[in-house]
């Protein structure tokens, strides 16, 4: 126990020296070796025994993770590493690489300042590597590169030492190309990865060795020696001469920024308040004596302590008993415990200063993305944006009726822990619907509900989440209130796709200062008057008021928007969410007496005008797509392409690398169920494949009616398709 106590003392001492702290994430594509790398770094830092590292999967502390052999949640751990005779505190987050858990990566990126990007030397950069790198650069997180599984190049692909260097060079070039395209200004500032400079390390996480140019100078081991050791299968000597943790952690300390350096640059990206205000300055300088500013990036449940909110402390210090505000709620909470992580364990400490990753209990109101502060009314941090959208839904029911109240509570809890999950109650069928990133995501959540929360559940077959949209612009439609005293004239038209993507990426929203929002929309091609008239944005739809001087309109606008939002949540054709629609109010006639223009009159009037308008404008379904990447031996390529095309897939690109064929395709999510088993049998089990979210596209006309019919039947709606006249009161 003595060693552990010493470790805790070192960690608590270093916590107070921001220049000695590095907050880093490890990111990569699935199975490129993130968790094995994390474990060996821990072993090197004396956190777990060296014999067990890599097999223990310390970071995968969840049974589900150990069973599936993949990381599902982001794990936090703190450790100490000595570099140039000085101790440094490294807060490490291991993130999942599976596309269904991309949400965890996005959240982890908010807490860290640097990222070790892990790439498999044999497979090279893969789609998920691009996705995670893009998330890191968007949050201004600086990357360094670790090329893993170098031994496989030598022993499995039998390349010679010259070919090995060429291949490794290609991997580095490709990563730099990605950085340059994703964030040109940071690339110019020197964020490229460069082996000669020392921002790239090569090695094998499993066999616990790594080499970089600074390490070669230090140990005298050359590339040729590495090649010879691998060829001879003598990994042990390599691991003794060039320990993995030393090469990687030295690189992290030398090249990745400390919190003070990082926050100067990052605060303006993730916080839109006044940089010169007291709290703005305090965050930019990671001031431990300033007001508290803490961003929650994860919520988990501890059986003893209750909800634990983990996140990054940008300003101030956390201590027990302090009272704090949480964004979005009016009442204060009292902090109960403050702790840091060591693997899956939390260690309670008295105080945590700015620049650290902290775990806090007592913040009942907090959700992922919350801002926690001692200032009343502080401008919250920008909300965390996820790259994908939920595309698959299952209905969840409790096996035993007595568990129903517990199930409702558990679903609320699960949604709080994982913000990429959407939980809704279907009012008509009474079912609870769970929408997630993919089949695996929902399977894992369902398993956890049963295992951790002890609620037995049954889940329906997965259902695809569709969207409704329109194809053309129509003349204004009149919506009348039930008492006939109020009329609204609204037309709908498709919203420009550039504006849609600006809304989705969070660039345009209603909380922006009006002039700034207006200018951004004009730059994207919207007319000035329209940009001026925006009164509501909901999902990727907007509502514009183009009327002039209508009495009482201001008082009723909120109700008109309620009607608009109701339709956007559930469109007229299939009651699926609506996307990419612009609704424009051009005229209105309102009763002078407020009693005759209440919610029961105004909401139905605006709702019906939009519903009828959408049906007149060719209401159509959009279906979600996934990009599918398949690596397969060239001889078996035919089976793989046939499998993809048989699922309405479009082959976007085919290339070859050695004897491997790499196929890139786009396939509707509806056709992807059961793909794992089928692709295995089509390619004799030799295909490696992965997916990422591929956006939405219009459903082909030939199958549109069938799909609409199936959705309506599932939701208990009438078989006949609705007509515009059904929504207009004559």
From Swiss-Prot:
PANTHER family given in the database record: ELONGATION FACTOR-LIKE GTPASE 1, TRANSLATION ELONGATION FACTOR-RELATED
The keyword Nucleotide-binding is annotated on this UniProt entry: yes
Function in brief: Catalyzes the GTP-dependent ribosomal translocation step during translation elongation. During this step, the ribosome changes from the pre-translocational (PRE) to the post-translocational (POST) state as the newly formed A-site-bound peptidyl-tRNA and P-site-bound deacylated tRNA move to the P and E sites, respectively. Catalyzes the coordinated movement of the two tRNA molecules, the mRNA and conformational changes in the ribosome.
Compartments where located: Cytoplasm
One Pfam family, short name: GTP_EFTU_D2
Domain called tr-type G: residue spans: 19-228
Protein name as annotated: Elongation factor 2
Keywords, ordered alphabetically: Cytoplasm, Elongation factor, GTP-binding, Nucleotide-binding, Protein biosynthesis
GO cellular component: cytosol; ribonucleoprotein complex
Top-rank lineage group of the source organism: Archaea
Cited Gene3D superfamilies: 3.30.230.10, 3.30.70.240, Elongation Factor G (Translational Gtpase), domain 3 (3.30.70.870), P-loop containing nucleotide triphosphate hydrolases (3.40.50.300), Translation factors (2.40.30.10)
Entry annotated with the keyword Signal: no
Principal localisation: cytoplasm
GO molecular function: GTP binding; GTPase activity; translation elongation factor activity
Sites where the protein binds GTP: 28-35, 94-98, 148-151
In-chain residues carrying the UniProt-annotated modification Diphthamide: 596
Family of this protein: Belongs to the TRAFAC class translation factor GTPase superfamily. Classic translation factor GTPase family. EF-G/EF-2 subfamily.
SMART domains documented for this protein: EFG_C, EFG_IV
Coiled coil: none
Gene: fusA
């Amino acid at each position: 126990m003595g060693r552990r106590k010493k470790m805790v003392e070192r960690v608590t001492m270093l916590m107070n020296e921001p220049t000695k702290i590095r907050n880093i994430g490890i990111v990569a594509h699935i199975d490129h070796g993130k968790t094995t790398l994390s474990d060996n770094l821990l072993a090197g830092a004396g956190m777990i025994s060296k014999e067990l590292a890599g097999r223990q999967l310390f970071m995968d502390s969840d049974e589900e993770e150990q069973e599936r052999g993949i990381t599902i949640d982001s794990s936090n751990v703190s450790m100490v590493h000595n570099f140039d005779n000085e101790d440094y505190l490294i807060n490490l987050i291991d993130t999942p690489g599976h596309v269904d858990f991309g949400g965890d990566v996005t959240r982890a990126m908010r807490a860290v300042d640097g990222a070790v990007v892990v790439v498999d030397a044999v497979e090279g950069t893969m789609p998920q590597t691009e996705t995670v790198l893009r998330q890191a650069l968007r949050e201004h997180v600086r990357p360094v590169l670790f090329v893993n599984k170098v031994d496989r190049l030598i022993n499995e692909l039998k390349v010679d030492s010259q070919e090995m260097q060429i291949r490794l060079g290609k991997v580095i070039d490709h990563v730099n190309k990605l950085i340059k395209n994703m964030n040109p200004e940071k690339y110019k500032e020197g964020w490229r990865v460069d082996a000669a400079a020392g921002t790239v390390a090569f090695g094998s996480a499993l066999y616990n060795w790594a080499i970089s140019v600074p390490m070669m100078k230090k140990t005298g081991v050359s590339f040729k020696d590495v090649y010879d050791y691998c060829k001879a299968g003598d990994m042990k000597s390599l691991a003794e001469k060039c320990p993995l943790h030393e090469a990687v952690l030295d690189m992290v300390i030398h090249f990745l920024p400390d919190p003070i350096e990082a926050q100067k640059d990052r605060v303006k990206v993730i916080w839109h308040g006044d940089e010169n205000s007291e709290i703005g300055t305090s965050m930019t300088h990671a001031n431990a004596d300033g007001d508290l500013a803490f961003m929650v990036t994860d919520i988990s449940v501890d059986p003893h302590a209750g909800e634990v909110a983990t996140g990054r402390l940008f300003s101030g210090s956390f201590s027990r008993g302090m009272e704090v505000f949480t964004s979005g709620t009016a009442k204060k909470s009292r902090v109960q415990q403050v702790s840091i992580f060591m693997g899956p364990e939390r260690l309670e400490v008295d105080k945590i200063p700015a620049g650290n990753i902290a775990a806090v209990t007592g913040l009942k109101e907090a959700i992922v993305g919350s801002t926690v502060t001692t200032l009343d009314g502080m401008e919250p941090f920008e909300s965390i944006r996820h790259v994908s959208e939920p595309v698959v839904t299952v209905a969840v029911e409790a096996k035993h009726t007595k568990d129903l109240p517990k199930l409702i509570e558990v679903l609320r809890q699960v949604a709080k822990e994982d913000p990429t999950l959407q939980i809704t109650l279907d009012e008509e069928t009474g079912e609870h619907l769970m929408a997630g990133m993919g089949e695996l995501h929902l399977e894992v959540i369902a398993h956890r509900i049963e295992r951790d929360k002890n609620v037995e559940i049954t889940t329906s077959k997965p259902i695809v989440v569709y969207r409704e949209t329109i194809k053309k612009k129509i003349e204004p439609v009149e919506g009348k209130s039930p008492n006939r005293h109020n009329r609204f004239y609204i037309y709908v038209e498709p919203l420009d796709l550039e504006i849609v993507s600006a809304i989705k990426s969070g660039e345009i929203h209603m909380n922006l200062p009006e002039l700034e929002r207006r200018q951004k929309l004009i730059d994207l091609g919207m007319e000035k008057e329209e940009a001026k008239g925006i009164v509501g944005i909901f999902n990727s739809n907007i509502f514009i008021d183009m009327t002039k001087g209508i009495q009482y309109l201001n008082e009723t606008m909120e109700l008109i928007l309620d009607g608009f939002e109701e339709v956007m949540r559930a469109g007229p054709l299939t009651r699926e969410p609506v996307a990419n629609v612009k609704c424009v109010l051009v005229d209105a006639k309102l009763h002078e007496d407020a009693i005759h223009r209440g919610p029961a009159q105004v909401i139905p009037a605006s709702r019906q005008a939009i519903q009828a308008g959408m049906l007149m404008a060719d209401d159509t379904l959009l279906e979600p797509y996934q990009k599918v990447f398949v690596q397969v031996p060239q001889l078996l390529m035919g089976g793989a392409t046939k499998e993809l095309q048989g699922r309405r897939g479009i082959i976007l690109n085919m290339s070859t690398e050695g004897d491997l064929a790499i196929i890139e395709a786009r396939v509707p999510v509806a056709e992807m169920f059961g793909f794992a088993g089928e692709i295995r049998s089509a390619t004799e089990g030799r295909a490696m494949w992965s997916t990422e979210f591929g956006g939405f596209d219009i459903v082909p006309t030939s199958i549109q009616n069938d799909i609409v019919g199936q959705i309506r039947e599932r939701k208990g709606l009438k078989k006949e398709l609705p007509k515009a006249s059904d929504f207009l009161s004559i």
